[in-house]
Amino acid sequence: MYIKTITIQGFKSYRDQVAVDPFSPGHNVVVGRNGSGKSNFFSAIRFVLSDQYTKLSREERQRLLHEGTSTSTTLSAYVEIVFDNSDGRFPTGRQELVLRRTIGLKKDEYSLDRKSASKSEVDQLLESAGFSKANPYYIVPQGRITHLTNMNDRERLRLLKDVAGTEVYEQKRAESTRIMEETDGKRDKILELLTTIEDRLRELEEEKEELKEYQEKDRERRCLEYALHQRELEDVTNALDEIEAERRQDIHDSNEKRKEFNDREDEIQRYEEALTAAKHSLSTTQASLRQYETERADLVRNKTELECVIADFETAGQVGEHRRAELAEELEVMQQKVDEATARLEDLVQEAEQRIGEEKAAREALEPTQSKLSVLFAKQGRAQQFATQAARDEYLRDEIKALEEHEKNQGRRVEILQNEVAGAKEQLAQLSAKSEQQAQGENDRRENLKKMNEEIAQLQTNIAGMHEQKKELWREEGKLTQIEVNAKSEMEAAERSLMGMMNKDTSNGLRAVRQIAKRLNLDGVFGPLYDLFEVSDKYKTAVEVTAGNSLFHVVVDNDETASKLLDVMNREKSGRVTFMPLNRLKSHSVNYPKANDAIPMIQKLQFDREYVMAFEQVFGRTIICEDLQTAAHYTRSHGLNAVTIEGDRVDRKGALTGGYHDVRRSRLDTVKAAKKWRTAYETDHARHIEVKAALQNLEQEVTRAMGQVQALEAKKRHISDGGEGLFKLLTLPARDLDQARDRVTRLESSLEEAEGASRDAKAKRASYEEELRTPMRQNLTDEELRELETLTQSVESQKKLLFDATQSRAKAVGERNRLEIELSENLRRKRQELRDKLDRLEGEAGNGELQSGEVELRRNELRNLVRDIEQLEEKVSESEGRVDELNSEISKISENLERVQTQQMENTRAIMRVQKNAERYLTKRQTLINRREECNNAIRDLGALPEEAFSKYTDQRSDKIIKRLHKVNDGLKKFAHVNKKAFEQYNNFTKQRDELMDRRDELDQSAVKIEELIETLDQRKDEAIERTFKQVSKYFEEVFETLVPLGKGELIMQKKTDGFIEEESEESLEQGREKSDIDSYTGVSIRVSFNSKHDEGQRIQQLSGGQKSLVALALVFAIQKCDPAPFYLFDEIDANLDAQYRTAVATMIHTLSTSAQFITTTFKSEMLAQADKFYGVFFDKQKVSTIKVIEKEEASDFVETAAQVGQL
């Protein structure tokens, strides 16, 4: 075994966690600067191995924690040593042992293999591995070698005794001495008690004779009293038997009456349920009857209204047909007028166009002639106008320039008018196309109106069918509402009754569980136990008694679900409840009796096998028996709970419970009723919701269909109203067409005028230009005069032609315009109005087919109403008959119920009388039992009776026995002073005397054994000291000779004899051991020689410092050989050695390291020469130490550097 690794954290200078690399099982050397933490490293090992730092105070623990210059504070520290246990020195069975010690300001803890351990366990484990408290020299810290060199002889003797283990012997001897003193004290007390007892025995011997006479009289008294008490006891027992027989008969009669009571209760319950059902049926039937009557009245009113509507339709159809004929005739006349006017208008249009052409040709012919004539007149008057030709030319040029500008303006105007004419013609073409489109739109409108009338008729038919479905659903909804209200009322009543059978906290808890489970959507909540099973009425009382309040326990899938529910319930403070998590319940095997008169209760329950654990928990150890005797038998034989069908229960622990059970307050019946009505309510409610949903869907369908009808009607009205708009649209294009034609005409006329003006200006400009090229004359030339005369005549004739053409054109255009106005504003409008009236009549009547379809629809609806009224008449008749039947049934059930209730009251009074008799029986029985108990107590108080007491006075009369008893009591009065316990006291004191004498003998034997033990301990202690001295002395000589081959050394025991101190070597001590006394030893001295094996040698006080250190080391090695340890720790043991001895010490350690581990620190190179592994200790500026493996050369360099620094 050896130290494998060491981990340090927070201990002294080792602030951070330092894990030392595995040590060599041989020789390990640790080097480092002074103050770097080498000694703290050894202190950490000693801290764990407990040879130091035991029972630390808070201040001492504080000093062990790291205190550096960093700002962080170390609050705890630990040192962990891992031992190689391959040789099995630690009895743990593992290859390694991990030992850790942890300290803090308020803790000091050990752990073994990562498990907490006490200090005593650690000490025992270390001692079992060879770590002796008597020999702590397997760890040699700094200063111990110096301490050994400075020891005097007496201190070395004390050290030898510690190594020999004399402290253990001293402790055992002190304990034996203490026990010996206690034994002497006990023996003295026993002697005093024996003296007192002997004196008391002599006094009791004198009282025994008088007591014997008293006992004879007392024996007779007890026999007489026994005879009297026994006779009374027999009388009381006989009376009890008679009462018990009467009680059993009464119980039998009571059971019969209770059975009748229970049967009658069931009958009453059946009658009440039948009565409730009949009343509910009556209420439902009456509600249906009222609904049928209301519907019948509504249908009769609707039938009357529908008949009136059909009559109105028929009348309106006849009037509409006559009016349509008149309008059609008027429309035909008006159409003829429009056609005639249109033909006349076409002729007038052609004539107007012709006259306009003639007017245009006349104007075009007049304009150039008149222009030339104007030029000649102007030229003629130019001579009077201008004095010179230059003035004339200037004027002509100005006129030519003005005419050119006028010509340009007229040209632009012509261009503008040409564009306007083209635009007007295009607009005229668009208006013509639009007029044709609107005419086509009118035809489409009529077709759409026809289709919409057909769609409206179909939708109205569908709506009528849906109204019939709604009526059926309304009737069903009314019926369901009444049924649902009744079911809910019964369910709430049953649940209130059930909640009244438990405390308020449980009731609130069950309600909260249902709400929380629904709110959190917990699927693992199965509900209260009573909701999860069914049982026949025969066993319900037995089941109720067995389950008790467990019926209200809530079954869940696992404890996690229960925890969620409990958390919310605690947070909301919503009652209390007990949960049964199925994953926590265990199945137990039960040995049921294999007999017909013992039925396992769980076999009579019907439940889902998923909940079997919960039911086994409550009912698994219970059986059902016929009577209490059978139940008690099986309870004793099989250790089960047993219950009778009536509810009397025998507990396997011995308790017997039973009595009357009110069947009217049965929890299971209430649960059954609650479940029944809850199921009925949920079914009715679900159906009610379905009916409501169906009604809502139908309402939506009807609303949608009516919306469609309204939309079609609105669209139809819009199209019908659009007829007038369409007329306006048709009229407006005609008017617009006329206006467009007029505008084209006006624009063309303006264009002609502009073109004529342009031509006139052009002709004038040409004349002026021509005149400008000729010389100015006072008069016209002859040719010009002839032309002037000709042009004058021509202009006059052309003007007359133009006037005539203008008059003809104005007349033709006026007639055309008047006819157009008449056609568009009068004839066409009247024709459209007639068409609209005819369309409205056709729309109101449904364009013939719609009107007849509407009438037929109304007639079908009337037939359906008649059929529905007949059906309702039948239903009303059936409902009235059903009401009469139910009233008769209710009356009959009420009579039967009243009769049974009267019988039940009589039976209840009879049961009450039996109960009162039972109470009287119980009172009388208790009195007799008390009297019997008194007799038994009296007999028991008589004590042990002689044999004659059971037969001596059995045949005598009671009065004689009483007379003789008085006489014997008078004789006993003279013995009033006698010590009645003399015999008992004598026997007790005799027994005590014998026991004390035995105890005294035992104490004497113990004292002898203790004296022998003390003598043996003294002898063993002397032997241990002598043996240890011999071994240490021997090993000292061997070690010293190894270290100093030329010298020798020995240990000398000093002994005090008659005031003188003698010295004995190992040989002389061996020879005189039998005569010696250990107590006479005064010390151990050391004598050595370093250069001779034969001279006397020197005492240690005479040696140099280096020699003293070597001698001390030799002594340490000798002690270690005497009691070897698995490893050794040496802290700078070679510090004071001379150079010539350091090599010898290093060689010895290397030799010893083959069988034990060595960990040493040094500043000398000799120790490094033969070491196996090297470690360096370093510290930083914050004085935090670390340790790590280094190479041998690095360790040598460090030692040499340290030596050089020391020399400086």
Curated annotation (Swiss-Prot):
Coiled-coil annotation: which residues? 187-362, 400-469, 688-771, 817-903
Q: What is its main location?
A: nucleus
Q: Which domain of life is it from?
A: Eukaryota
Tell me, according to the record, the phenotype of the null mutant.
Answer: Does not affect urease function.
Q: Which GO terms describe its cellular component?
A: chromosome; nucleus
Q: Which InterPro entries match?
A: P-loop_NTPase, RecF/RecN/SMC_N, SMC, SMC3_ABC_euk, SMC_hinge, SMC_hinge_sf
Per UniProt, subcellular location reads as: Nucleus
Pfam families for the chain: SMC_hinge, SMC_N
Is Nucleus found in the keyword set?
yes
Q: Where is the composition biased (Basic and acidic residues)?
A: 756-773
| Start and end residues of each stretch annotated as Disordered | 748-773
Subunit details for this protein?
Component of cohesin complexes.
Q: What does this protein do?
A: Central component of cohesin, a complex required for chromosome cohesion during the cell cycle. The cohesin complex may form a large proteinaceous ring within which sister chromatids can be trapped. At anaphase, the complex is cleaved and dissociates from chromatin, allowing sister chromatids to segregate. Cohesion is coupled to DNA replication and is involved in DNA repair. The cohesin complex also plays an important role in spindle pole assembly during mitosis and in chromosomes movement. Is unrelated to urease function in C.neoformans.
What family does the database annotate?
Belongs to the SMC family. SMC3 subfamily.
User: What is this protein's record name?
Assistant: Urease accessory protein 2
Taxonomic lineage per UniProt? Eukaryota, Fungi, Dikarya, Basidiomycota, Agaricomycotina
